[in-house]
Amino acid sequence: MGRSRCARRRLSLAARAALCSALPYADLHIGNVRAFIQPVVAYAVGVAPAAGPVDRTGVDILQGFAEVDLGAVTLRAGRQMLSLGTERLVGTRYGPNVPLAFDGVRADMTLGKAQLSLLAVRPVQPGPGSFDDATSDRKALWGAYVALPELDLYYLGYRNRAARFGELEGREVRHSVGVRSYGTRGAWRWNVEGVAQFGHYAGQRIAAWTIGTEIGRRLPALPLTPQIIMRANVVSGDRKANGTLGTFNALFPKGKYFGELSPIGPTNIINLHPGVALTLRDDLSLSIAGMAYWRYTKGDGIYDIPGNLIRGPGNATSRFIGTQVEAALSWQATPEWELSTSLSAFSPGAFLRQTGPAETIKMFGLESNFRF
């Protein structure tokens, strides 16, 4: 059993890339003991300037763990994928060709209506060849996540021995405390999450935060049963030379953070994201969205989803990064086979024009998922 996925992506009119991956697995249960193994086969062609670790890894072990079910407590050790809440800080990185896995231990407990997860892990760093994925010797993650009805509470600790923010590199120890409220009432649904971060980095203290909101309403009386969605995110950034690092670290977030093909990550940003989802048929859905991005502080630049700086602040005076429109169509052709396509265009704003090249990015994606 498993899943295979192929995608073709086109950025502007010149760049084309094809990415394919397969994730078969074997899952053995003997009494209260479970053994699970999942290889990954991931290749990429045409990625410019070169395919990175999230694009290809050859053939390797994505997951391989043993699990013991003790009733109210489940213990797991080995290589595993993690998904906490909405994957704002810890996710499977689905979207890029190579999902994210961790090596370590996890315990899940049921305490009345609460679900408690404890974890101590290190991320897996994919290599360019086969069977060369390795446990990170620089990064570590530990913490606790409590899921209650319509409420999540969590603490996550993170260490990076060689973190880089701007021109400075050093040891980062960061603590994240978060709360999430979510649920539905009739045709309305909501998902609101806030995170505060503190710690130290290269002789500076850390003080960072984020607030994300999503409010949606279904309109079942209208044709195509539209759902109107409004998302807004505010993520802190750094201010120059004040002895405090204000740059938020999203740790290990989901790959499709702001949309199917967004080039901007959740650091030093203000984002507005209205959209509508339509049910064309039981097996066919369409979503259309618009995004606008601003820098939260002028003293910090913009980052990609993994947290790498992609444009420094320079001498720019503008906060406005740009706008994006996106449409995604998904067809569940069979219970096992899903086809989807995405079309997106990102138009640069004044900040990008003030700091370097600023061309419109046009993106087109085709994706096929087969679960067997």
Predicted regions and their residues:
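Beta-barrel outer-membrane channel/assembly domains of diderm bacteria
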Residues: M1-R79, V105-T110, Y182-N191, Q197, ...
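Short acidic (Asp/Glu) patches
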Residues: D60-I61, V90-G91, A101
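Solvent-exposed loop/turn segments at secondary-structure junctions
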Residues: A42-A44, M81-L84, V124-Q125
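Hydrophobic pocket-lining residues within nucleotide cofactor-binding pockets
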Residues: M1, L82, V235
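"Short basic amphipathic alpha-helical interaction patches in structured regions
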Residues: A51-P53, V90-G95
